[in-house]
């Protein structure tokens, strides 16, 4: 989910309030509910920017927001109050069903309900056809984009942590939401050429910790891999390569 309220082109532009709104949202999201009730455990909660199973993965969002993975209205209320944000916050939440599937309607109806818990947000849930959606979401030199908060999915081009960072957080990224953080940008460049696995893993964790504070995006769910095999079939392996390994399968 991409979040950019109170952006530079908005009439009430305020960086501190914008960050508080993002952090309040992060405190209210219940990923377990989305994974179990909407997707029947075909997705799992994601509390990091690098998926579980890849180098550098760390559940930074779980520690920073909510109560150990569960939502916290009290924390959300406090962060908004401390920033001087008047509640309820009017928030337009955009999603797309023809590209991301019919379950998106149920997912974002649940998110709307979660965000409105405690009366902190008033959410206007909207759906747009994909071609228009993909145009309207981006930031240009004249606009912060038409959608303050919107759905965005991702399937990696290759199985490496960098493919979950560079496309989202480097300057000139494909998300094109106007986000820029020099420290994060420099660290992403650094990890891409590190050959020491332990050193790179630490750099990757540092990037996630910084982004957990910025919250230019809020990860929600990670796809779960599933294989069905007979009881007499052994050696079925599912891993971060996203490839089914026939060489290990025996009967």
Tell what function each PLM region has.
Residues 1-47, 91-100, 195-213:
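Alpha-helical secondary-structure segments
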Residues 1, 19, 23-27, 32, ...:
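Solvent-exposed, polar/charged alpha-helical surfaces in well-ordered, non-transmembrane soluble domains
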Residues 1-19, 55-75, 138-145, 166-193, ...:
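Short, solvent-exposed loop/beta-turn-alpha elements that line the ligand-binding surface or hinge
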Residues 81-156, 169, 225:
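Ligand/substrate-recognition segments at binding pockets and active sites
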Residues 36-40, 48-49, 103-105, 161-164, ...:
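Short, solvent-exposed loop/turn and secondary-structure capping segments
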Residues 45-82, 99-106:
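Structural transition elements
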Residues 31-34, 41-45, 52-56, 97-101, ...:
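Solvent-exposed loop/turn segments at secondary-structure junctions
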Residues 1-3, 33-38, 131-169, 192-193, ...:
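Pocket-flanking alpha-helical
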């Amino acid at each position: 989910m991409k979040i950019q309220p109170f952006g530079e082109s908005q009439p009430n532009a305020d960086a501190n309030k914008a960050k508080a709104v993002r952090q309040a949202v992060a405190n209210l999201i219940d990923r377990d509910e989305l994974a179990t009730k909407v997707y029947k455990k075909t997705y799992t909660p994601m509390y990091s920017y690098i998926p579980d199973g890849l180098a550098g993965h760390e559940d930074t969002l779980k520690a920073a927001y909510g109560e150990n993975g569960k939502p916290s209205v009290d924390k959300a209320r406090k962060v908004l109050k401390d920033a001087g944000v008047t509640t309820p916050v009017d928030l337009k939440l955009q999603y797309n069903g023809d590209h991301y599937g019919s379950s998106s309607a149920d997912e974002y109806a649940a998110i709307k309900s979660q965000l409105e818990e405690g009366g902190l947000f008033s959410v206007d849930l909207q759906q747009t056809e994909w071609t228009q959606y993909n145009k309207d979401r981006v930031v240009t030199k004249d606009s912060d984009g038409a959608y303050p908060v919107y759905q965005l999915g991702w399937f990696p081009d290759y199985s490496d942590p960098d493919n979950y960072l560079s496309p989202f957080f480097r300057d000139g990224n494909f998300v094109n939401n106007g986000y820029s953080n020099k420290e994060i940008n420099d660290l992403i460049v650094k990890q891409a050429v590190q050959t020491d696995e332990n050193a790179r893993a630490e750099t990757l964790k540092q990037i996630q910790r910084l982004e957990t504070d910025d919250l230019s995006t809020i990860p929600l769910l990670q796809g779960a891999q599933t294989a069905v095999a007979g009881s007499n079939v052994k050696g079925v392996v599912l891993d971060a390569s996203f490839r089914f390994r026939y060489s290990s399968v025996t009967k």
